[in-house]
């Protein structure tokens, strides 16, 4: 059999949340299901796995939309995967596999992966694999309703792609396209190389000149360097001779100056002594003078204060006299102001009484005006309302007259409609009786089938409950099995690890570990049973492991021997092999140690026991264990340990359960314990416990495996029963569907008839009501018309009466407002007089208050002045006494100052003599130092010249030390030698700017030009060969397309005539050659004129497109073809023709058809149903026909 699609596996793609597999055989497979169930998601999945990149084609907004997005009860998935498996026994695809599986995987992050037979590949590899097979996103193996429309009326490019796929030139076009790309790249590379070559060749000539100049520059530079080197060494030799002479002179000056400096130092010390004594005398003199002047200043200040105080006393006495006179004047002014206040109060009372009378008159006027204005406002509103009513009456009367005419006309129309509807009602009633009889018969048949389905479904539900229960139990058992297996593996690994640790002495120090291994392997001439490790011979409860291990310390690695002879042999072996040191405990000589008066500690809270008594061991090791642990007590905590230690006077070790230690002598060890990688003491216990756990786990695993096998067997039986019941239900459902369709048709017809009859009946009743309403409305409207006419006359009379009353009221208001204005003017005048009188009262009152305040202020001022006079008199007496004392003290200071002046003159004479000697000696020293500095400067200058020469020798000649310099250089004529150097420099200068890199650059450029010239020749040859390939490929494509296009035209005409039972169809190549021209479709259905396909009806278009599809399949059958509801627009007769063609073509092509149509289902070999038992999640049900 030729290649065909074996399976589609979908997981997480769109609505297929669970892993779903569709298995296909040859022939026709139909996929059916209600709208929205996810049928088309299967064709989208195939299109997607074949490399579709258009999100729009996949009916999404972005590529991640194809991943299952979750439902109310399910979480979104992180990836989706689709796999197609094809049978490739005939090796139609270019891979050496019988089955080829193509897969695509997409992650929610946007990352996409492609696989061929589970090997990751590129999208391009998948396109190349299916090229010219009709399979692929651009092929015609997947045709949907949208693709049908594109085939007929879409872009010319899309149509040509499909027809070229059928004509078998896609592979050639792809190869030509690849060759064109290579040619384009070759041309670009050729242009690039030519540009680079041109640039290099332009650069080569100037670079050749620069290369020659650089060579000349290097030759002259080398000669100049040699001559400059000779001159520099010769100069260095002469400079060194001068330096030696100058250094000798410096040593002589330094020696002479040293003696002069000693003498100068002694003279300066004498001068300093005189200066210090003189400074002390002068300091004392200065202090006395300062004190003298300070006291004189104080006397002046005291005398000034006395004068000032006398003046202040006189001023204050004058001020008191003036204040008394001012008090008397204030009292007289106050009496006059009080009399003015009394007069103003009388005037103010009279004005307020007159103002009250005027206010009462104004209030009466205002009340009368408000009352009349209110009445006028009310009448104006009534008048306005009456006028509005008049307009409304006129409008209502006009409307009523028009409405009455309309009502009479409506009544006549209602009578005509009632007669027509009565006739229709009787016709509908007869048709309903006939439909009801048909429906009753069908319902009986449907009821019987439903009962059968219900029985089968109940049995399936019972089985499903059983399956679910078994599945839950199975899941629990399998989870338990998985956990137990993991536990078993962990226990086994732990057991092996512990045994391995025990076997290889893991946890002991390196020396002991190696020693015991060698003893066990008989590398040491010692019996294996004569040596034991302390950590191996003891066993104990788990709770004591930490404290005993801490108690043992390094002793845990001690080696127990039967006697001291074995210990000596082992020690010698360790020394000879340089294996390190170990501690040995010979049983024959070791003596145990005990705690005396142990009973004293046993009653203390927290005491547990002696460490040696808490472990188990063989009797032969008792002395050894007593030696190690006999003087160690174990207690519960650190507080207990301190209590025991104090009582025992810190004479032995105490260890707590948590590992804290109080050592003998008082040292304390404690804190957190690091996790132990190897528990030596508890290892035996751990091995035994782990072995028991392994055995128990094995037994449990055997029981669980037996339970799982039994549950799976029971579950399989229930599944088989369910499949039988489902098969029966499926057959009944097909029959039930047919009956339901018939019943639905009858119900729809009956419903329409009933609705039509009810509509007619409702309309009749409504018309009768309308007729009655019409009559009542007519009578009411005529009655309203009479009433409105009467009301209109009354309204006009009332308006006239209101307007006369309004006129009278307005005249009355005018008279009252004139009287009110007169009174308000009078009130304003009185108010002004009152305000003026109040201001005068306020002014007088304020002046009296100010006088009172001033009076109090003057009295206070007099009292204060009297106090100040008394205080100043006291200060004046005190200052006079102080001035007298200061004058006596000043006389004593004057005597001390005169004595200090005499002593200062004597010391200055001595200092002048010594300073003269210092100056003479300093002059001599300075002259010597000046000579010394001159020599130093000359030396510095010479050394600098010397360093410069060394620097030049180092930098220019690469001479780095004196050893490299040959000082025997001789120059007969230095000036002539320097002249040659100047000539060389001039020659170098004439060369101008020199590019030393040009030498290397010139060589490299020559190499590059040679290489690029070779590359250019290769590219020209490649370009010519590619052009030949493209021309040959183009001719091949034209030939193949032309040949197959003729066949395709014939096939299209034949299939069109078969499907339409006559007519004709053609494919026409226009505007260009075979590879670029447009391809138009022209058709002529039977009995119609020849026309463009775009002018046909939807059904005709659909059938024409199907004809073209089958024509393409005739010329080049695809291994499989997926058709997604392409017959949707066809009527039942054309669906049958389409189905016949499917059956006919299914001999060469495998068809997977997504359909709703009964005719297509009937020719199918296998039916797959797509349902959504869970909202948002598609599920597949299969049925082989």
UniProtKB/Swiss-Prot annotation:
Highest taxon listed in the record's lineage: Bacteria
Disulfide bonds: none
Residues that bind ATP: 34-41
Keywords in alphabetical order: ATP-binding, Coiled coil, Cytoplasm, DNA-binding, Nucleotide-binding
InterPro entries linked to this entry: P-loop_NTPase, RecF/RecN/SMC_N, SMC, SMC_hinge, SMC_hinge_sf, SMC_prok
Main location: cytoplasm
Positions in coiled-coil regions: 174-376, 412-526, 679-1039
GO biological process annotation, one example: sister chromatid cohesion
One Gene Ontology MF term: DNA binding
Domain SMC hinge: 534-644
Gene Ontology annotations for the cellular component aspect, listed alphabetically: chromosome; cytoplasm
Compartments in which it is found: Cytoplasm
Family to which the UniProt record says this protein belongs: Belongs to the SMC family.
Function of the protein: Required for chromosome condensation and partitioning.
Domain commentary: Contains large globular domains required for ATP hydrolysis at each terminus and a third globular domain forming a flexible SMC hinge near the middle of the molecule. These domains are separated by coiled-coil structures.
HAMAP family associated with the record: Smc_prok (MF_01894)
Assembly with partners or alone: Homodimer.
Protein name in UniProt: Chromosome partition protein Smc
Source species of the chain: Clostridium kluyveri (strain NBRC 12016)
Gene: smc
């Amino acid at each position: 059999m030729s290649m065909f699609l074996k399976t589609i596996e979908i997981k997480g793609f769109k609505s297929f949340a669970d892993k779903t597999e569709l298995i296909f055989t040859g022939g026709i497979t139909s996929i059916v299901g209600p709208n929205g169930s996810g049928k088309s998601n299967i064709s989208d999945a195939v299109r997607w796995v074949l490399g579709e990149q258009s999100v729009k084609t996949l009916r999404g907004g972005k590529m991640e939309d194809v991943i299952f997005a979750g439902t109310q009860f399910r979480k979104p998935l992180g990836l989706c995967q689709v796999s197609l498996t094809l049978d490739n026994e005939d090796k139609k695809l270019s891979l050496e596999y019988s089955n080829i599986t193509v897969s695509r995987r997409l992650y929610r992050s946007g990352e996409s992966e492609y696989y061929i037979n589970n090997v990751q590949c590129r999208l391009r590899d998948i396109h190349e694999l299916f090229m010219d097979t009709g399979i692929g996103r651009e092929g015609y193996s997947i045709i949907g309703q949208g693709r049908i429309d594109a085939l007929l009326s879409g872009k010319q490019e899309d149509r040509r792609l499909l027809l070229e796929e059928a004509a078998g030139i896609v592979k050639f076009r792809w190869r030509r396209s690849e060759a064109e790309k290579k040619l384009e790249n070759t041309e670009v590379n050729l242009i690039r190389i030519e540009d680079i070559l041109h640039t290099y060749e332009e650069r080569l000539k100037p670079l050749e000149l620069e290369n020659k100049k650089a060579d000349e520059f290097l030759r002259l530079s080398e000669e100049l360097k040699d001559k400059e080197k000779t001159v520099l060494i010769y100069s260095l030799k002469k400079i060194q001779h001068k330096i030696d002479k100058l250094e000798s002179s410096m040593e002589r000056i330094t020696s002479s100056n040293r003696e002069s400096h000693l003498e100068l130092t002694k003279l300066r010390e004498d001068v300093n002594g005189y200066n210090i004594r003189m400074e002390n005398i002068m300091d004392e003199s200065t202090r006395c003078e300062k004190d003298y002047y300070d006291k004189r200043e104080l006397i002046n200040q005291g005398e000034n204060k006395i004068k000032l105080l006398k003046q202040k006393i006189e001023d204050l006495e004058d001020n008191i006299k003036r204040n008394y006179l001012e008090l008397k004047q204030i009292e007289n002014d106050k009496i006059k102001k009080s009399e003015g206040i009394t007069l103003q109060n009388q005037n103010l009372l009279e004005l307020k009484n007159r103002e009250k009378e005027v206010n009462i008159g104004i209030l009466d006027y205002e009340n009368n005006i408000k009352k009349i204005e209110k009445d006028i406002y009310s009448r104006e509103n009534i008048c306005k309302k009456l006028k509005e009513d008049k307009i409304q009456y006129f409008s209502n009367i006009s409307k009523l007259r028009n409405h009455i005419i309309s009502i009479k006309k409506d009544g006549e129309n209602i009578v005509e409609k009632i007669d027509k509807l009565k006739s229709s009602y009787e016709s509908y009633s007869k048709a309903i009786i006939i439909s009801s009889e048909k429906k009753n018969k069908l319902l009986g048949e449907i009821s019987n089938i439903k009962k059968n389905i219900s029985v089968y479904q109940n049995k399936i539900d019972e089985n499903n409950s059983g399956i679910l229960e078994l599945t839950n139990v199975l899941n629990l058992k399998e989870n338990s099995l998985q956990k137990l297996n993991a536990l078993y593996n962990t226990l086994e690994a732990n057991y092996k690890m512990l045994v391995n640790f025990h076997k290889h002495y893991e946890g002991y120090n390196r020396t002991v570990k190696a020693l015991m291994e060698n003893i066990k392997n008989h590398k040491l001439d010692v019996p294996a049973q004569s040596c034991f490790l302390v950590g191996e011979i003891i066993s104990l409860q788990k709770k004591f492991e930490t404290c005993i291990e801490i108690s043992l310390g390094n002793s845990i690695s001690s080696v127990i021997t039967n006697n001291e002879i074995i210990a000596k042999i082992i020690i010698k072996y360790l020394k000879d092999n340089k294996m390190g040191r170990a501690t040995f405990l010979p049983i024959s000589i070791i003596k145990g140690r005990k705690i005396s008066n142990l009973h004293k500690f046993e009653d203390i809270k927290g005491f547990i026991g002696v460490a040696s008594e808490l472990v188990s061991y063989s009797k032969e090791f008792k002395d050894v264990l007593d030696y190690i642990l006999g003087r160690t007590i174990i207690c519960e905590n650190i507080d207990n340990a301190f209590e025991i230690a104090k009582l025992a006077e810190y004479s032995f070790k105490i260890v707590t359960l948590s590992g804290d230690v109080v050592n003998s002598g008082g040292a304390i060890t404690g804190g957190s314990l690091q996790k132990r990688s190897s528990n030596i003491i508890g290892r035996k216990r751990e091995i035994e416990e782990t072995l028991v756990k392994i055995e128990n786990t094995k037994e449990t695993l055997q029981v669980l495996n037996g339970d799982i096998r039994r549950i799976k067997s029971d579950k399989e039986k229930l599944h088989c029963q369910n499949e039988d019941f489902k098969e029966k239900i499926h057959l009944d459902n097909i029959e039930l569907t047919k009956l339901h369709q018939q019943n639905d048709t009858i119900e729809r017809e009956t419903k329409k008839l009933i609705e039509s009859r009810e509509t007619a009946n409702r309309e009749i009743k409504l018309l009768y009501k309308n007729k009655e309403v019409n009559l009542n409305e007519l009578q009411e409207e005529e009655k309203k018309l009479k009433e409105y006419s009467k009301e209109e006359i009354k309204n006009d009379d009332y308006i006239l009466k209101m307007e006369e009353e309004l006129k009278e009221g307005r005249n009355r208001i005018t008279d009252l407002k004139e009287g009110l204005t007169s009174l308000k003017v009078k009130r304003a005048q009185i108010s002004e007089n009152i305000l003026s009188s109040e201001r005068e009262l306020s002014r007088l009152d304020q002046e009296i208050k100010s006088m009172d305040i001033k009076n109090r202020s003057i009295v206070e001022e007099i009292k204060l002045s009297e106090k100040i006079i008394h205080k100043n008199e006291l200060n004046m007496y005190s200052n006079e006494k102080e001035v007298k004392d200061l004058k006596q003290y000043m006389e004593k200071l004057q005597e001390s100052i005169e004595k200090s002046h005499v002593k200062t003159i004597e010391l200055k004479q001595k200092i002048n003599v010594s300073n003269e000697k210092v100056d003479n000696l300093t002059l001599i020293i300075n002259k010597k130092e000046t000579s010394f500095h001159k020599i130093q400067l000359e030396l510095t200058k010479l050394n600098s010249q010397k360093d410069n020469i060394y620097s030049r020798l180092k930098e220019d000649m690469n001479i780095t030390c004196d050893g490299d310099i040959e000082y025997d250089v001789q120059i007969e004529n230095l000036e002539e030698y320097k002249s040659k150097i100047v000539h060389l420099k001039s020659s170098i200068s004439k060369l101008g700017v020199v590019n030393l890199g040009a030498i290397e650059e010139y060589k490299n450029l020559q190499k590059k030009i040679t290489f690029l010239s070779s590359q250019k020749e290769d590219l020209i040859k490649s370009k010519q060969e590619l052009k030949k390939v493209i021309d040959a490929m183009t001719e091949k494509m034209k030939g193949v397309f032309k040949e197959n296009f003729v066949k395709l035209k014939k096939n299209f005409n034949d299939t069109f005539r078969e499907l339409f039972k006559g007519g004709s169809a053609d494919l026409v190549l226009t505007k260009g050659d075979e590879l670029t021209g447009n391809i138009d479709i022209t058709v002529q259905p039977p009995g119609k004129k020849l026309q463009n396909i775009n002018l046909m009806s939807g059904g005709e278009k659909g059938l024409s497109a199907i004809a073209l599809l089958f024509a393409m399949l005739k010329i080049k059958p695809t291994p499989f073809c997926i058709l997604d509801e392409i017959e949707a627009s066809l009527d039942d007769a054309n669906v049958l023709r389409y189905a016949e063609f499917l059956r006919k073509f299914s001999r060469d092509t495998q068809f997977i058809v997504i359909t709703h149509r009964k005719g297509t289902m009937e020719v199918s070999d296998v039916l797959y149903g797509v349902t959504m038992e869970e909202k948002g999640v598609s599920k597949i049900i299969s049925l082989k026909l």
